[in-house]
A protein has these predicted regions:
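Membrane-interface alpha-helices at helix entry/exit sites of multi-pass transporters
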Residues: 16-17, 54-71, 244-256, 287
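Intrinsically disordered, low-complexity non-transmembrane regions of multi-pass membrane transporters
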Residues: 142, 174-210, 241-254
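Membrane-embedded alpha-helical modules
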Residues: 66-179, 295-364
Length: 364
């Protein structure tokens, strides 16, 4: 009956609201362990985890995380406003991208990963080639033959991104710190003071970086499948290329955080453009939103703005509210994170290792 339909409609609205709020805040949440432990919480946070952690080791944890949360909120708000004002236009641009454009965009993203690599770019290139090799493991999409599976049924499914990232960043960092001769010698600032001190001057000094990162993030996010991690890497590389302080990169430079954190959060709202206008998911999370809309009987596409505008505008408002709430909630999360650093390393690293293993298997 009508009451049942309204009840189900409320449930779906809450589900979409939860997904939107999560996508708008999750990337910044991944910045916190990156700064504290050099273990990024999300793939998008990996682009600048080194700079963020080095800032923390220099006693500038407040500046690093304060800049992260404010730039993430600004990038998210800019992306949401562009999403509201220009969703159909951005979708038309995204549809002009063929396989050729996506190929060169991927090449650009991979090149940026080498450019921003710390130290020798030869080592960065070797790491890139090794990563590309890992991505070829599994069934060949065109022919259906297993590649480099060595007779293993598990490898025939390929190596998914989550285990690869956990192994590359989390497990490797745990091994590095456990094997350090003097584990206590590597100190990270444990007291967290005023997170907004100095952030205003940073934003004014790098205001063009914020605008550029937010714009790039929104445009890249509107491309189906590009994602926030590609937006972060490309924005980082472009920011480094045009920076007046290139020599400061790799030593803990806040400019890198400004570029990348504003870009990756802006790309989240941009990913909803192809999802709502054409029903093409911009990333994995927008694919979930499309699934929820289909369960509600709403077909994403050009008609969604005409037939069910209340859902579209609800998502607009949810994005704005989520990014506004990101600042106070992010500050609270940062304040609480200091308790992580008070845990003895002999307990902390086994706990992180156990969480990594559980998280990897939980995906399947």
């Amino acid at each position: 009956d009508d009451r049942t339909s309204r009840g189900l409609g409320d449930v779906y609205k809450r589900q979409i609201g939860a997904v939107v709020a999560t996508t708008a805040t999750a990337i910044f949440a991944g910045d916190i362990p990156g700064a504290l432990l050099r273990i990024p919480g999300t793939p998008a946070s990996a682009a600048y985890v080194e700079e963020s952690h080095l800032l923390s080791k220099k006693g500038q944890l407040e500046l690093a995380l304060g800049s992260n949360v404010i730039c993430s909120a600004i990038g998210g708000l800019v992306g949401a406003l562009v999403f509201i004002l220009a969703a159909p236009s951005l979708a038309e641009i995204a549809l002009l991208f063929s396989s050729y454009e996506y190929f060169w965009l991927t090449v650009l993203g991979l090149s940026c990963a080498v450019i921003i690599s710390r130290g020798s770019q030869v080592k960065g290139t070797i790491s890139l080639v090794f990563g590309l090799f890992l991505s070829t493991i599994g069934l060949d999409i065109a022919m259906g033959y297993p590649r480099f599976s060595f007779g293993s049924v598990d490898l025939a499914a390929g190596i998914s991104i989550l285990p690869a990232l956990i192994g590359s960043f989390a497990i490797s960092e745990i091994i590095r710190k456990v094997t350090t001769t003097d584990l206590r010698g590597e100190k990270i600032q444990q007291e967290i003071g005023n997170l907004l001190r100095g952030v205003g001057s940073v934003l004014w000094r790098f205001r063009l970086n914020v605008a550029r990162g937010s714009t790039l993030g929104t445009l890249i996010g509107a491309l189906p499948g590009a994602g926030a991690d590609m937006a972060a890497y490309i924005s980082f590389a472009i920011g480094k290329q045009y920076s007046k302080e290139k020599g400061s990169y790799g030593t803990g430079h806040v400019e890198a955080l400004v570029d990348s954190s504003s870009a990756n959060n802006a790309s989240v709202s941009g990913a909803y453009v192809p999802a709502l206008v054409f029903g093409i998911p911009g990333d994995t999370l927008t694919a979930i939103v499309i699934g929820v809309l289909f369960m509600k009987g709403i077909n994403p596409g050009p008609t969604v703005f005409i037939n069910t505008p209340e859902f579209v505008y609800a998502i607009f408002i949810m994005f704005l509210i989520a990014n506004i709430c990101l600042v106070p909630l992010g500050i609270i999360a940062i304040k609480l994170s200091r308790y992580v650093l008070s845990i003895p390393p002999s307990l902390l690293f086994p706990m992180i290792l156990m969480t990594c293993v559980i998280g990897t298997f939980a995906v399947h």
